[in-house]
Each structure stands twice: as C-alpha cells, then as structure tokens.
Amino acid sequence: MMESLPTLLLATAYAPPVSYFVKLYEHIAGTIALEGCEHYIKQSYRNRCRILGPNGVQSLTIPVELPAGTKTPIREVRISDHGEWRHLHAQALRTAYGASPFFEFYADELMPFYERRYTYLWDFNAELLQTLLAQLQLDLDWSMTTGFLPPQSSEATSECCDLRYTLSPKLVAPVPGVQLRPYYQLHLERMGFVEDLSILDLLFEMGPEALLVLRDSLQA
C-alpha cells in the first residue's frame, strides 16, 4: 500500500514561485494547509513576487498596512493603495510578458486582479491562487490552518512538510524534493535561464505545458 504523504504546510503568497506549485502538484492527492494564524512576515513572498523583465529580475511588492504592527495576524494585513501599485504591477507584467507566447491567452483571467480593490492581502492571494490553479488545470483542495504550529515543534517536523519559512526570496537553499526543470523564457538567449520566478513567468511562457514542467521538476 502506498504510504500517505505528510500534510503540506505553506504560507500565503502573492503569485508564488514555481517551486511552491511543484510542491502543490506533489501533494495533489494529499492534505494541503495554508498558514492563517501566523503574524505577518516582512520581505517574504506573502506580498512579493519575482518576474523577469527586459532588464532582469524584478520584484513586485504589494504595499501593506499593519494595524497591529509586527504582531498583525496575516489575515488582518490590509492592502494599501499607496503608490498606485495595481497599475504599476499590471504595466510591469505587460512589459515583461506582453510578447510571450501565452500572455494574451491568460490575460483575461489574470489581469482583472489589478483592477479590483481588495481590502485584505489574504483574500487577494487566496483568490489569485485559485485562479492560477484553474489555469494550470491543477485540481486540488487546500484549507486554512485553525491554529499556529511552531516551526520547530515535533508535530511540524514529523507530521508536516513545513515550507512556511523555507520558501523565501531571501533564501537560496533548494526546496526539498524539487529540481526545477528549465523551460523557455523570452530573454533566455540574452540572460540565460532564471529559475524559481513567479508562476506567472511559467504560465505566460509555457501555457498548457506548464503542468508538465511542474511534474518534471519533482525529484524521484
């Protein structure tokens, strides 16, 4: 009998990196939980994604407001309208991927996220995640945690695949079980392959074949 997978525990993220979706693919038949009880963490994928523009890697950051400062629960983090970020992110995506093979194919589903106004970062990320899963044809269910599990607890280390703090733009360590497969990128010849960008990069460049890249990025 096949051994069941441990629960996959992830943080909420803005258009998460490819490795995040590789782990989702791996646990498609298992239990997946997104951390809903932590305090907000700065300089993380929770409100930041990385894309590849004509001048190199570019970070897109959603400005946020923290009603309780550093102790603000992740579900209470508010999106700030400071700096017209929606317009800037939409323009950055069009500049980076407007000439990519599948940008127009997905634009009608994804670009409206930069027109709607969301109050909470959690809600924006969750709805965008659902749309991304649908475009990838990745049929899975996830739930929100109901209590905080300390990362060093025995339960987190033995019963979970805990990647809440492993997947970070500040860490270069490989994600356990993931060996990212290179794929076509618009600026490949000039810049070489840049791995683990936002899933938007993979979708806009590879379209329906994105799911195959996720599959082939799992280490045996």
Explain the meaning of each model-derived region.
Residues M2-A220:
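Residues lining hydrophobic/aromatic ligand-binding pockets adjacent to catalytic sites
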